[in-house]
């Protein structure tokens, strides 16, 4: 998600609700936080017994309770408005770092590629983040030549790129600076793709005020990512009507500019298109609007109810954050039943063999200090623990210069 990603949280959540069957949905709601969120909304749905309707209430309430710092929020009120996430619906953690979604999504895509997992990953961020190092480094790493030229074939017999779509909300502003013609050099964000691989990241500039244009573009990008042709980039042109924050008086732009963009309101324009096209009637849209008001009124009242939605009491329970932060569990592997993909048995690794000859005690049998070359050192201990994990957990990967031929500044990774 982007820096402030409430809309993305809801969009991804609603998509998951639509795709999951009722049994899966209910199990997710029942098991998450021991059913704490579910217990607040269950029985209050407008259509009793309708799991999809219940799940929508669950999503809205979990997100809003998080914004209001309630223990019934998705992250028990500790994430707040900018850091909410819900992994069961595929909503990855957000952060306060501008452009921080790019490397998080890159890591998720790298996981999918390295572990031959299905699906794609989408990183959402604004045009104001396109000058940030994490974003530009993510562009570069996502298109590294080695991914498609050296990493070897997957089960499909091809060498796929990373399944990641960098989705830029190009709303012309980063806080108060206008990216086009002021704070950036690219003019149009889609041009960035030309700097990172021969395919120019399949970059495309799209009218973000036209939902059908966005759907078409994302569908095409999804198809090419699933074919292994990633990464991809979309420059979705939109506009930020509101200020950056509540204290933003928008003094950096004119009233005329704001009014012109408001006249082009995409929600109203799309509604009119659907009515003119005979897809839906004005009465149907009125009914939808009324149902949204009823639902949100209900959810807001629940989220601010101190009894149903309490805040965390750190005076009564000072250890609660520690319990949330640390699982106190030990998982030897993140994927049970799958064998690690290794080049040789661990016992045949040359460095493992050489370490077996080293003393794990600093003195010989006569009490004399052994030479450092003959003793098991700190770098050896680090290497041993790392390589042990690679033979336990098939999802673990290592990358970076330290893992290349030289083995790092202290030879921890050598061998």
Residue ranges and their predicted role:
Residues 1, 122-126, 204-207, 396-402:
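Short glycine-rich or small-residue beta-strand-to-loop segments that form or flank ligand, phosphate
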Residues 1-27, 31, 38, 42-46, ...:
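Conserved acidic/glycine
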Residues 1-164, 175-200:
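Cofactor-binding active-site loop characterized by glycine-rich and histidine/acidic residues
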Residues 102, 125-131, 141, 168-174, ...:
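Acidic, glycine-rich active-site loops and adjacent beta-strand->loop/helix elements
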Residues 110, 115-119, 185-220, 263-291:
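Conserved thiamine diphosphate
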Residues 120-124, 165-167, 233-235, 397-399:
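Structural motif
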Residues 137-138, 217-220, 415:
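Alpha-helical scaffold elements adjacent to nucleotide-binding pockets in ATP/GTP-utilizing enzyme cores
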Residues 223-228, 233-235:
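Long, amphipathic alpha-helical stalk/connector segments used for oligomerization, subunit docking
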């Amino acid at each position: 998600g982007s820096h402030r990603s409430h809309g993305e949280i809801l969009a991804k959540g609603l998509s998951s609700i639509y795709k999951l069957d009722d049994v899966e949905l209910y199990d997710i709601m029942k098991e998450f936080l021991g059913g704490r969120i579910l217990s607040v909304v269950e029985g209050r749905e407008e259509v009793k017994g309708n799991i999809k309707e219940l799940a929508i209430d669950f999503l809205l309430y979990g997100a809003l309770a998080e914004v209001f710092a309630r223990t019934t929020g998705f992250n028990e009120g500790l994430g707040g408005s900018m850091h909410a996430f819900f992994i069961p619906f595929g909503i990855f953690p957000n952060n306060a770092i501008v452009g921080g979604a790019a490397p998080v999504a890159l890591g998720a895509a790298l996981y999918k590629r390295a572990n031959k997992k299905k699906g794609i990953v989408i990183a959402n961020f604004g045009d104001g983040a396109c000058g940030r190092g994490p974003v530009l480094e993510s562009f570069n790493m996502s298109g590294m030549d080695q991914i498609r030229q050296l990493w070897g074939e997957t089960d499909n017999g091809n060498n796929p790129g990373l399944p990641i779509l960098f989705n830029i909300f190009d709303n012309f502003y980063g806080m108060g600076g206008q990216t086009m013609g002021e704070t950036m050099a690219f003019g149009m964000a889609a041009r960035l793709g030309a700097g990172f691989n021969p395919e120019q990241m399949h970059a495309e500039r799209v009218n973000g005020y036209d939902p059908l244009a966005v759907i078409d573009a994302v569908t095409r990008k999804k198809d090419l990512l699933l074919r292994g042709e990633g990464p991809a980039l979309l420059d979705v042109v939109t506009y930020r009507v509101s200020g950056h924050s509540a204290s933003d008086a928008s003094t950096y732009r004119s009233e005329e500019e704001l009014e012109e963009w408001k006249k082009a309101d995409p929600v109203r324009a799309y509604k009119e298109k659907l009515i003119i096209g005979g897809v839906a009637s004005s009465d149907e849209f009125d009914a939808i609007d009324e149902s949204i008001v009823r639902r949100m009124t209900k959810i807001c009242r629940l989220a601010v109810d101190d009894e149903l939605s309490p805040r965390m009491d750190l005076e009564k329970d000072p250890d609660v954050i520690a319990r949330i932060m640390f699982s106190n569990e030990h998982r030897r592997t993140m994927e049970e039943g799958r064998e690690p993909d290794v080049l040789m048995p661990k016992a045949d690794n040359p460095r493992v063999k050489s370490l077996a000859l080293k003393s794990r005690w600093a003195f010989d049998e006569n009490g004399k200090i052994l030479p450092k070359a003959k003793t098991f050192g700190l770098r050896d201990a680090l290497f041993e623990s790392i390589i042990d994990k690679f033979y336990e957990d098939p999802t673990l990967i290592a990358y970076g210069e330290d893992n290349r031929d030289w083995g790092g500044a202290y030879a921890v990774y050598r061998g």
